[in-house]
Structures are given as structure tokens and as C-alpha cells.
């Protein structure tokens, strides 16, 4: 079975108790760190783990495994988006059994809250 997954995710960067938090709003997953890059790296690891689990479980509508983040975070994202966004790509390794992965990557829109 061939598998292609490509979608745009929404990442919100904000601070909680002095720690930088990266929040994938579509999957309601978070990563944290001392700075933005560490938080994003931790979040990307969580996103990859969810994708690996989904594909190995043959659940190909990955976003149905997760709940979306609460509306207050989407509001923070929309507010932060007014200050500008960055777009990045998160590649997912093609060596995922039991399917042939034709394409698997995410583009994420990154907005930083004030």
C-alpha cells in the first residue's frame, strides 16, 4: 500500500513560566525548551512519533487520532499571526513499515505570541 501525507500544521510559540513552549494546534501536542529552537525540536519529535504510530497502526487519517487545541490557543495563534509567520517543512523518514511511503512531510506555519 502506498501512503502520501502532506498537510499544513499550525505551531504556536509562547512562554509558560519562563519556558519556551511550541504547540502544534492541529494535534494538541507540545514541546518545551530553553529557547524556540529547542521547543520546536522537541515538538517535531512528538509529531514524528505520532506519525510513526499512525502509519504502523494503519491509521492513515492521522489528524483523527488527535484533538485540536483549545480555542484560546487558536486565538493566540491568530493574534500572533498578525506580527508575521514563518513556514518550515518537517520531513518524515520514508522507512516506515508496513507501507511504501511515497511522500510524508508537514509544512508548518509558525507564529510567535507576544
Regions found by a protein language model. Give the residues of each.
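Compositionally biased, intrinsically disordered low-complexity regions
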Residues: 20, 33-35, 86
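Short aromatic-glycine-(Arg/Gly/Cys) micro-motifs in beta-strand/loop hairpins
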Residues: 7-26
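Intrinsically disordered, low-complexity segments enriched in small/polar residues
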Residues: 16, 29-31, 67, 82
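A short, exposed loop/beta-hairpin motif centered on an aromatic-Gly-Thr core
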Residues: 25-38
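Short acidic, gly/pro-rich beta-turn/loop elements at beta-sheet edges
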Residues: 21-23, 32, 55
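Short, charged, surface-exposed hinge/linker loops at domain edges
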Residues: 1-8, 37, 41-114
Amino acid at each position: 500500500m502506498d501512503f502520501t501525507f502532506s498537510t499544513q500544521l499550525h505551531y504556536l510559540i509562547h512562554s509558560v513560566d519562563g519556558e519556551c513552549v511550541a504547540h502544534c494546534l492541529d494535534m494538541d501536542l507540545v514541546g518545551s525548551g530553553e529557547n524556540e529552537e529547542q521547543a520546536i525540536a522537541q515538538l517535531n519529535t512528538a509529531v514524528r512519533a505520532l506519525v510513526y504510530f499512525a502509519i504502523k497502526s494503519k491509521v492513515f487519517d492521522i489528524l483523527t487520532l488527535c484533538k485540536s487545541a483549545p480555542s484560546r490557543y487558536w486565538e493566540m495563534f491568530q493574534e500572533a499571526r498578525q506580527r508575521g509567520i514563518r513556514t518550515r517543512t518537517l520531513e518524515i523518514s520514508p522507512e516506515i513499515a508496513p507501507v511504501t511511503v511515497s511522500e510524508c512531510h508537514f509544512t508548518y506555519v509558525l507564529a510567535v505570541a507576544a
